[in-house]
Design a protein with these regions (language model features):
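Residue(s) in the substrate-gating loop at a strand-loop-helix junction
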Residues: 132
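Active-site helix of classical SDR
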Residues: 112, 148, 156
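Conserved glycine-rich cofactor-binding loop
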Residues: 10-11
């Protein structure tokens, strides 16, 4: 059975991705920052929940021994964990900038590094980074979020060139406006702005 590690698995896009992998007969390792009944959410025992904060390198190191699947390999990493802290730039607190950049960009560095070492040893694997259309187009009130997601595109392109010769794929997906717990936190103006970018509304 193939295995996948998905960060930010407790809700929204991450949980939907996990369900898709379960349907395709993968064993799912899913992370979140707090306790979560992943088996119940996925209606499957082919999964394991790991409590980890992608900002905490010691926390990541402590779970790596639990990651390899039944063949002592990890076939795929999905970097999905992310946060928003929307605010007009002139009013944005340092902490709102730091928290978003640390989770959405540095957090991906933190977990991808040990996973890529594992994949280099096995000479195979796939890394999928979840960016956002906000990283392509920008959004008012999301300078921090858009910056983190735009930077992730560069991260992906560069890492892909480094790892491709060793048989490891690195790709990035930029979802548009998707109904989720994160988008439910947007103001009506932000929702209207996002919807205005969709030709069919």
């Amino acid at each position: 059975m193939k295995s996948v590690l998905i960060t930010g698995v407790s809700r929204g896009i991450g949980l939907s991705i996990a369900k898709e992998f379960i349907q395709n007969d993968y064993f799912v390792f899913g992370t979140s920052r707090s306790k979560f009944d992943l088996s119940k959410a996925l209606e499957s025992n082919n999964c394991k929940h790991l409590i980890v904060d992608v900002n905490d390198r010691d926390s990541i190191a402590s779970i790596m021994k639990d990651i390899p699947g039944e063949n002592n390999t990890l076939d795929c990493l999905v970097n999905n964990a992310g946060i928003t802290a929307d605010q007009l730039f002139i009013r944005m607190k340092d902490s709102e900038w730091d928290d978003v950049i640390n989770t959405n960009l540095t957090g991906i560095f933190n977990i991808t590094k040990p996973v890529s070492k594992m994949m280099l040893k096995q000479k195979s694997g796939s890394i999928i980074n979840i960016s956002s259309v906000s990283g392509l187009m920008g959004n008012a009130g999301q300078v921090n979020y858009s910056s983190s997601k735009s930077a992730l595109l560069g991260f992906t392109k560069s890492l892909a060139k480094e790892l491709a010769p060793r048989g490891i794929n690195v790709n990035c997906i930029c979802p548009g406006f998707i109904e989720s717990d994160m988008t439910n936190e947007l103001t009506s103006d932000q929702r209207d702005q996002a919807l205005s970018q969709i030709p069919l509304g």
